[in-house]
Amino acid sequence: MHSKYNQRLREQGMDIDAIVNFINRNNEFHTKHFSKEYNLALTSAFEHFTAMLAEIFFVEKRTMANADPKLRAMMAWHAVEEMEHKAVAYDVMQKVAKVGYFKRCLAMAHVTLFLSYLTIRFTNRLLKNDGIPFGRRMWMMAKCRWWLFGYKGIISSHLGTLFAYFKPGFHPWQQEAIHNYDAWVEAYERTGDPMIAGAALYQAAH
């Protein structure tokens, strides 16, 4: 799915290879310069973050309201997948690698800063590929900050999910799946159609 999605972006003129190469270089850097335990802690933190993004995308209609139905269905599939395996890396980190509290929290802080940087960097690149001038790109990204981080913003409304990771004794399954998760499961089991399941997840959102 990821390869097909990236190819579709290439066909639309997006410089997706620069993004993929940047990610691959960063993965190689982390593998070379950090311990296996810390890399596992980073993986666990990434999994928690992506599970939180699944919540952000689909717990309320406003986030995906203007998305193409096919894109929304793909993102719904990915969101459900992230929610269902969100504890796997965490359990390996805790039970096998025996990563301690400090390293776990450090990895989450690392991931939060890194993903924030990537969001700005890649959004700017893709907008540039669309031919949008620099000044307008900066204005567009500045204008959306309130939508993301302001009062009842898309991200600020879910910071509790993120910060819960820093609690001693935390486990991902202490946080329940979003309220409309069962709507996706029921629709997919009944029809086998990700488009119908994605629509069901979206329609059941607040």
Walk through the language-model features, giving the residues of each.
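Non-heme di-metal
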Residues: M1-H206
